[in-house]
UniProtKB/Swiss-Prot annotation:
Organism for this UniProt entry: Arabidopsis lyrata subsp. lyrata (Lyre-leaved rock-cress)
Keyword Metal-binding set for record: no
Bias-annotated ranges (Polar residues): 1-13
Name of this protein: CASP-like protein 4A3
Cytoplasmic compartment spans: 1-126, 189-205, 266-276
Length: 276
């Protein structure tokens, strides 16, 4: 085994300083790309010079690159911020639109239900009014028919036409019968054709006034006839004449009740003319 001097051993074991410089040059790739042509390896002095030049260039390149980064980095943030902002603005509008549509649909459904309830109530009122009109027709017909037939024969015979109270009761019931018959026909025609026989803007007021007047007249006529019957019975006692007069007066009083309810319905129609 040949002997080796200490100088040679030290030179072999000590790493060349150019390795570190080579590592540094190899690490910096940006400088190599910036150069127009690749430079061949040089000596240690030239490599150290190149390192110094690279170190000088690095701050300049960083200074040049930093403004670009500062200018570019806010742009994505602004875009993202604007995008997020627009999304946040759009979402509430959609929610509000949905809520508004729900409210509007709820209001429409509530309005439809109110209209249906009102139309149903109007139909019920019309049928009730027709029922009272038919009752008035029947009761008034029975009342004046009995009163017109209240006559007795013989030497002690008597007749209703001799007493003004009975004549008054018969006349009022005849008028009530004619008026109630016309109103019953008009209501029946309105339920079928949805229009009146005589259409006028004063018709509800006319019905209300006539119902009130006839109800008052029927009450007065029935009261006057009852007074005459009571006077007859107290003087002469009961007989067929007084019994028929009493039956006619009872029907006249029931006719008054029917007209009283009809006057309430006509008052309702007067203050709700839009439904007519």
């Amino acid at each position: 085994m040949p002997s080796m001097s200490p100088s040679s051993i030290s030179t072999e074991k000590s790493p060349p300083p150019s390795d570190t410089s080579m590592a540094i040059v190899a690490f910096d790739n940006s400088t190599t790309h910036l150069s127009s042509s690749p430079s061949p390896p040089h000596s240690l002095d030239h490599s150290s010079d190149s390192e110094k030049e690279d170190e000088k260039r690095r701050p300049e390149s960083r200074r040049n690159k930093n403004p670009v980064k500062i200018e570019e980095t806010p742009s994505p943030i602004v875009v993202v911020h604007n995008h997020n902002r627009s999304v946040k603005e759009v979402v509430p509008t959609r929610k509000t639109a949905r809520v508004g549509s729900g409210r509007s649909s709820g209001q429409r459904s509530g309005a439809v239900l109110a209209i249906l309830r009102r139309s149903r109530r109007e139909e019920i009122v019309k049928f009730v009014a027709l029922g009272f009109r038919l009752s008035e027709v029947v009761l008034a017909l029975i009342s004046f028919s009995i009163m017109a037939a209240d006559k007795t024969k013989g030497w002690s015979g008597d007749s209703f036409d001799r007493y003004k109270e009975y004549r008054f009761c018969l006349s009022v019931n005849v008028v009530a019968f004619i008026y109630a018959s016309f109103q019953a026909c008009d209501l029946a025609y309105h339920l079928v054709k949805e229009k009146h026989l005589i259409s006028h803007h004063l018709r509800p007021l006319f019905e209300f006034i006539i119902d009130q007047v006839l109800a008052y007249l029927l009450m007065c006529a029935s009261t006057a006839a009852v007074t005459r019957v009571d006077d007859w019975v107290s003087n002469w006692g009961k007989d067929d004449f007084t019994e028929m007069a009493s039956a006619s007066i009872a029907m006249s009083f029931l006719t008054f009740l029917a007209f009283a309810f009809s006057s309430l319905i006509s008052g309702y129609n007067l203050f709700n003319q839009d439904s007519l």
